[in-house]
Amino acid sequence: MTHPAPAVSETRTARRRPSVVWSVLALLLVLPVAGLSIFRAVPVEWPLPVVQLLSFTPWMVLPTVLALLLAVLGRRAWMVVTSTVLLAAQLFWLFPFDAGKAEPLSAGTPTAAVKVISLNSEYGGADAATIVGLVRDNGVQLLVMQEFTQGLEDRLRSEGLETLLPQHLNKPNDDASGGAVYSVFPLEAEGQLPDTPFTMDVTRVLVADPAAGSKATLHLTNVHTLPPVDDRIAQWRSDLGNIARQAARPGNQLLMGDYNSTYDHSEFRAVLDSGPDGRKLVDAGTAAGARFSPTWPMEGPPLPGIVIDHMVTTPRISSSNYSVRQVPGSDHAAIMATLSIPAG
């Protein structure tokens, strides 16, 4: 006497077990990604832990891809759909087509090309020889530094930086508030942003491009916000608000440095939305598709890298050859690009 039914039932149960396991694993990956995605999608002033977690949003694409693969193996349609929607959101945020882009200039508009670099030197600890090498090897014409100290200034002078970039406006300080601008072009101090613990100087750079026979005026802000940690998060938001007000001013604006924020923070995106006449500013790194080219931390704790150093311009300025370069002695990477600045 045979009993085929139980055998079939046992086979189905055996097949169902791995399907359930894959689905559970997919769910375990989906839940935290979905939670962070809600915070990312809603632009409000989130509390400190959420603000810090949002910095790592780009990395969420990896568990989302894995969740989708597990959902397919688990053969749960609702899980496949959920994972697909989450993956689409991560890709949209990773490569945002609604981000600010450089505006095309009218035919015949003269422009001046400038090679620029920015570096947070981490309390002046960055290797001076590497900095000077980057300037020399890449033909850099404008260098901006944060956390600039007297010791770093002395080492850079010994390495010959002032021969390459003879114009400079420096405010060295042994705490994190120091800053410096080195240039081949004449520099004029315009002031500084108000009510910021770290000095954020505004400098007029009188750019000239002999090859193109053009000149342009660039208003440079050396950005260094307080980080969003402990009770300093309110000042971080205030600093970004001050930067936004500067960005709304007329003329060619370059706001470059350590924002201590990523594109995934609504506070930073609010800065990008504050361009003159309501136009969007351009984050050169985001425009170059470099959201997976972290600028911090280059040293120290083994955290997933994030992009907190930015080169932000008004939309009439275009950028090319954006890159991130590591500098020994600093936990930040240097960011570098060539800017095309309209005359005027």
Regions found by a protein language model. Name each.
Residues 1-16, 44:
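Terminal targeting segments of Actinobacterial cell-envelope proteins
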Residues 116, 122-136, 145-344:
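Soluble catalytic domains of enzymes that build or remodel membrane lipids, polysaccharides, and related
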Residues 69-77:
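Structural signal for the C-terminal ends of transmembrane alpha-helices
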Residues 25-70:
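Membrane-embedded alpha-helical segments of integral membrane proteins
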Residues 81-137:
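N-terminal signal-anchor transmembrane helix
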Residues 14-29:
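N-terminal membrane topogenic signal
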Residues 141:
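Short acidic/polar active-site loop segments enriched in Thr and Asp
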Residues 38-45, 72, 91-101:
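Transmembrane helix-loop junctions and nearby membrane-interface residues
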